[in-house]
Amino acid sequence: MFYFFLSSLLNYNFLLIAAAVIPAIFLMVKVYQSDRLEPESTAVLWTLVRSGIFSCLIALVSEKVFSSVLTLIVPQNHPLYLVLLFFVVVAFSEEGAKYFMLRRSSWNSPEFNCQYDGVVYAVFVSLGFALWENISYVLHYGFSTALVRSVTAIPGHTCFGVFMGVFYGLARRVENAGDSEKALLFRVLAVVVPALLHGAYDYIATTNTNTWYFVLFIAVLFGASYWLVVKTSREDRYI
């Protein structure tokens, strides 16, 4: 009887984890398949996913620290509280952690020799982050959460990764061309732009009672990200 119960529990948890992981893997494959010039090695991709998982742990600590500081400065019932929480604490903790691990694991890689590589690298880090976060959510809240996050949060992290990767690839290109000032600007944008999008995503999802505003936002976000992937892939070149 105990064995049957344990076996059922393990099978259920396996299904939950599969439901959490499969959407992220699917999106990784789609972005990877768009790498026309020189697809990255499995070793590089696995390093990026692990970096994304580690960035999730960094962000968790950062969010706890800075959200505690925020509550000391701004009352939780103040209208400004949620703005600062989502746009500053959560968004910059998560996107900043992703960027930190992205740069640490790929900036000096000899395989970083095409502009579209920046998109692949950033998306794999973002989805490593999302994969770990999703497993945690799904194990706590079940299949319904897996279904909702598979069409919202997982693609959302992918989109943030696309925007980060576009600027990251541009930064590498102009750095190789000797323009370090413009490279710095693109590196800053690689954090700021996805952080602002992330903050808007969380803020609209949490505070807006009209679901259609959120649906419209993610439709535009997904559409813009898809267009960027297609454009960057089509115009890819060695750098």
Describe the residue ranges of each PLM region.
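Hydrophobic alpha-helical segments at protein termini of multi-pass membrane proteins
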Residues: 1-239
